[in-house]
Amino acid sequence: HSEVIFRGDSPTGKFTPWKNNPILTQRQLDAERPNPVTCAGHADLVQTREGDWWAVFLACRPINNTFENLGRETFMMPVKWSEDGFPYMTQGDDLVPVIVRREGVKRDESATFGNFEMNDGFDGQTLGMEWMTLRAPATGLYSLSQTPGYLTLKCDSVSASEKKVPAFICRRLQHHKFECSTRILFCPQSKAEQAGILLFKDEKHQYFLAVGRDDQGECISLRQIGDGESKVLASVRLDDGGVLTDLKVVSRGTHYDFYYARQEGVWYVLCRNVDAGYLSTATAGGFTGTTIGMYATLK
């Protein structure tokens, strides 16, 4: 990936390319460099009120120089100017920095980048802006008022493997290493009913940590969902008569660990060392990244 620039006397041309194109790229750099930023491109140039020029562009942060699950993220860099009047961000072995510091700008408590913790009790009238649904607003598939203090999902006859609108409330992964947990109040009445945490890359690449039922009764399972198939990676029987279940996903960057609890704080391992690369751009294609959230289905 790269960004190149041309200059012309009018919007209709003729256009002359800069002799030192590209003005932004990382493709020629050592893949084993520390903290690499890759796939840089799609840049826009903006000017501040002070007259400074900055570039806003897309790029990726791979884990261990192998794959990424974060999609192409938004980066910023100050723009430099060549002696012959062309703007550029990198030349030669210049690195795109992971963090750019600008005088007068500091991080505050509302920052949604870097390391942070977010808890949502779903006690408002609307979902926060960080939450999203697939393709459409999912009207009628969730409620914040049916049980105050809970997000209520409808077990609908649509699955996240279809290009439709499932009962899936999710947010984008922002870190390779993270922990995500939820408390679920759910008593499945049939083998079709399932609810839990879904890691979703696309219709053919998912992990589903779910409370459900099988022939022997209520259970918790981890499924790897692929192209027209679903494989159970782990399952455990629930025979304690409880209705509350805590579910947790811990990402160590290259692998996921999945946990469950029926008593607060008493966590049990369901499955460890699950390949995070299954949800990556390298495996699934695309640059949209992985999402994670609460999901319910009848399929």
Task: Put a short name on every predicted segment.
Residues 1-299:
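Carbohydrate-active catalytic/glycan-binding domains of CAZyme proteins
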